[in-house]
Amino acid sequence: MKKKISLSCSLCKNRNYKTNKSVQSRLQINKFCKICRKSTLHQEEK
């Protein structure tokens, strides 16, 4: 079963993306942050 999670920017801590995940480990993805206006590492938030 897939869990719904939100991804937050590692610099400004803004929650920019919502997605589903099916793996047990925490997600870390490089995505564009519209607040920072650059591509940053986004981490899974509970």
From Swiss-Prot:
* Any one annotated GO CC term: ribonucleoprotein complex
The intrachain disulfides are none
What keywords are annotated for this sequence in UniProt? Ribonucleoprotein, Ribosomal protein
One MF term in GO for this entry? Answer: structural constituent of ribosome
Gene Ontology terms: biological process: translation
Q: Which family does it belong to?
A: Belongs to the bacterial ribosomal protein bL33 family.
Protein name (Swiss-Prot/TrEMBL): Large ribosomal subunit protein bL33A
Source species, please? Mesomycoplasma hyopneumoniae (strain 7448)
